[in-house]
Each structure stands twice: as structure tokens, then as C-alpha cells.
Amino acid sequence: MPKAKTHSGASKRFRRTGTGKIVRQKANRRHLLEHKPTKRTRRLDGRTTVSAADNSRINKLLNG
């Protein structure tokens, strides 16, 4: 049986930390920012961890 491949789209969107958590970028901060409040764009800045409900699914995509 051939080796399972890592999902290339998931590998671009998710990163694993040293402790094993999976982090992602927040959505809604790519374009059309001029009508979004500055408070909202600041809140959407940075990374956040993946929710526990999605953790196992993303693990399968990343591990192949």
C-alpha cells in the first residue's frame, strides 16, 4: 500500500507548535478592510489554536 500523503492545502494553513497544538490564522483579514472597524482588525490579528472539535480531523490531514 502506498504512503499516505499530507494534505497540501492543510499544510499551508496550519502549523504545529512545539507542544503539539495546531495553530491557524484568523479569517476575515485579507481584503475589504476599509469598512471593518479597527477594533475588529486588531482582534483578528495574530494566530489562534484550532478548536478541540476540529483537532483530530486536521491531525489526519497533516499526518497523511
From Swiss-Prot:
Record key words, sorted: Ribonucleoprotein, Ribosomal protein
Composition bias type Basic residues, residue spans: 1-42
Gene3D superfamilies with a match to the protein in the record: 4.10.410.60
One Gene Ontology term from the biological process aspect of the record: translation
Protein source organism: Mycolicibacterium smegmatis (strain ATCC 700084 / mc(2)155) (Mycobacterium smegmatis)
InterPro entries tied to this protein: Ribosomal_bL35, Ribosomal_bL35-like, Ribosomal_bL35_CS, Ribosomal_bL35_sf
Signal peptide: none
Family according to the record: Belongs to the bacterial ribosomal protein bL35 family.
Protein's name according to its UniProt entry: Large ribosomal subunit protein bL35
GO molecular function: structural constituent of ribosome
Region feature (Disordered): 1-64
GO cellular component: cytosolic large ribosomal subunit
Highest taxon in the source lineage: Bacteria
Polar residues bias locations: 48-58
